Amino acid sequence: MKNYPVKKNDVIEVEIIDLTHEGLGVAKVDHYPLFIENALPGEKLEIKVLKTGKSFGYGKVLTVLKSSEQRVPVKDENFTKVGISPLQHLAYGAQLSFKTQQVENVMQRVAKLQEVPVLPTIGMNDPWHYRNKAQIPVRKIDNQLQTGFFRKNSHDLIPMEHFYIQDPEIDAAIVKIRDIMRKYSVKPYNESDNTGNLRHIVVRRGYHTGEMMVVLITRTPKLFPISKIVPDILEAIPEVVSIVQNVNPKRTNVIFGDETILLHGSEKITDTIFDLKFEISARSFYQVNPQQTEVMYQKVKEYAALTGNEIVVDAYCGIGTIGLTLAQDAKQVYGIEVIEEAVKDAENNAKLNNIENATFTAGLAEELLPKLVENGLQPDVVVVDPPRKGLDGQLVNTLIETQPERIVYVSCNPATLARDIALLTEGGYEAKEIQPVDNFPQTTHIESVTLLTKAVD
């Protein structure tokens, strides 16, 4: 038996001194950290110890003895249960400060770069109702088809109709589709024995166009009575221009399967970023917060500082949103993306906007960029927008060897950003400025844009 200062089921009084990067309150008992959900710095709480481990433990709030001035009423207790909005109890201004501090902390701790300016996080005027996409699981509860979200760390569905961080038109559409499925006794998916059929309802909506896409994700290709379901959806939701069925027969947590069937209308919806049109398919990666995407891309344009003469490489280009945004001010843009379907979308989006100075190639940036250089291309600006795992080590080496004048790094993970900045700094680059942008209010996710330039000897 380990001799910790607290043990499971102890009821103790603590004071919260900090927040973790996941938004949990931190208290210490004889230097032993306890992490507590729904707790804010400065609060005095009575808690119950839930679990103890070698380095830290977890607790649960029983009573708030002294509340933080930054605490605000929560929108919905179910939000806490499912973990969708772990910061909903923290005033929005304090959320922004928390995110700025997280970036500063990781830059100092991981990159050992205290002097890099981290600007205040750019927030939203209304930090709710921002998501343009919903992926809602479907299950049977009390013998009825239900939509909602899974309880944290479980596959128990909690029925929900209002998600608050999603476009309210999407919330309303989900409820209407749910009711249509109930009307026709569609069988919801049963994960335990891999029976039933309807697994998820996915809805995408163009922020500027209002166009809506409905994706019905099923276990089998047969969805009865589809001849009645489709007209009912169109009648209930006039904004729908695309209805798609996606078939996923596997026992997996992955939402989409490989087979997609068009049931009505177009395979894509259209939305705009600045004055550019983009076509979005069921599986396209497209930024989920359209308002903040424009804020973030404006910062990318500022850091790229294009004059019309530059060669730009857009690594991890997706469907071309960043590259095509920059093409208007560049000599030539080369987009690189590992997913072939996204490359085709990027090419189509270039045609849609009559942009002729952008080309897109399928492959790994760490393999294709050296080939471009071998063929005589010298990029002036490289934009990288990697997944959470950050840059591939080989790509970091390639960037250092290629020596573009500027690197603009769009990050969704401060820890891997700091790691990569440290490596690029060793390779002769200097991080000039980091601008966090709050694309995900009420959550702990942090996006940022960083400018790196060649260091001056």
From Swiss-Prot:
GO terms for biological process: rRNA base methylation. It is an enzyme of class 2 (transferase). The keyword S-adenosyl-L-methionine applies. It comes from the Bacteria. The keyword S-adenosyl-L-methionine applies. Belongs to the class I-like SAM-binding methyltransferase superfamily. RNA M5U methyltransferase family. This is Uncharacterized RNA methyltransferase EF_0728. It comes from Enterococcus faecalis (strain ATCC 700802 / V583).
